[in-house]
């Protein structure tokens, strides 16, 4: 259980972490239902492991005391700082020097948090361009990821649009070009709260100006709507 919990920490930091996050306040940044969904333990159980407390011995019925301190506070806090440093360092996905991305440091989970590698995503987007020549040169063309996990697919599309010669001609000002792309061209759905936060923090985390804006990204599991044939109506409801 502890090893499994340790693997979830980077996901929580990507979704909810701030520079002030420590072991002492870790339970305050994550909603209980999200924590339990990902780790299979409750925040109350986490606090018991961290802080200790009285408990009933199920074999004898006696009240006993557990001292807690199951986590090494120094190691835990240092690990948080290191992950957040990497997150900042790798945030600018427009920088060609960033060959890695933060998802190289987030272990896959047993839930649907398994991220497609960056190289595979780039191939997928190149294939999209082969099948739709000039799609990244058209300021009226729209793109949607119906099942976001990391946000990598959207960021690859954003990069191609942003770097397009035709888009540069239409929007010479880089800020205006980016704003147009985010407001008019890219859309995404994420199936759960933690995935929504991970994806949007990655997509918009390269810039303080954009981070925190909602744009056209929504928390919605598209699968049931796709199965019953009502996805088109749901998209109209979400995006108008």
Label every PLM stretch briefly.
Residues 1-240:
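SAM-dependent methyltransferase catalytic region
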């Amino acid at each position: 259980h502890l090893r499994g919990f340790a693997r979830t920490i980077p996901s929580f930091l990507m979704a909810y972490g701030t520079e002030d996050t420590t072991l002492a306040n870790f339970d305050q940044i994550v909603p209980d239902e999200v924590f339990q969904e990902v780790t299979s333990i409750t925040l109350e159980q986490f606090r018991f492991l961290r802080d200790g407390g009285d408990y009933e011995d199920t074999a004898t019925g006696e009240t006993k005391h557990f001292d807690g301190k199951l986590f090494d506070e120094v190691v835990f806090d240092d690990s948080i700082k290191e992950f957040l440093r990497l997150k900042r360092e790798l945030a600018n996905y427009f920088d060609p020097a960033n060959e890695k991305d933060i998802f190289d440091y987030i272990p896959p989970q047993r839930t649907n948090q398994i991220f497609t590698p960056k190289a595979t995503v780039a191939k997928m987007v190149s294939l999209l361009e082969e099948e739709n020549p000039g799609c990244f040169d058209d300021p009226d063309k729209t793109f949607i990821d119906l099942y976001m996990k990391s946000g990598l697919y959207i960021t690859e599309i954003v990069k191609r649009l942003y770097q397009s010669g035709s888009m540069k001609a239409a929007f010479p000002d880089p800020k205006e070009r980016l704003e147009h792309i985010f407001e008019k061209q890219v859309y995404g759905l994420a199936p759960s709260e933690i995935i929504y936060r991970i994806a949007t923090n990655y997509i918009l985390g390269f810039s303080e100006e954009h981070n925190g804006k909602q744009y056209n990204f929504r928390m919605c599991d598209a699968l049931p709507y796709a199965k019953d044939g009502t996805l088109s109506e749901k998209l109209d409801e979400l995006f108008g």
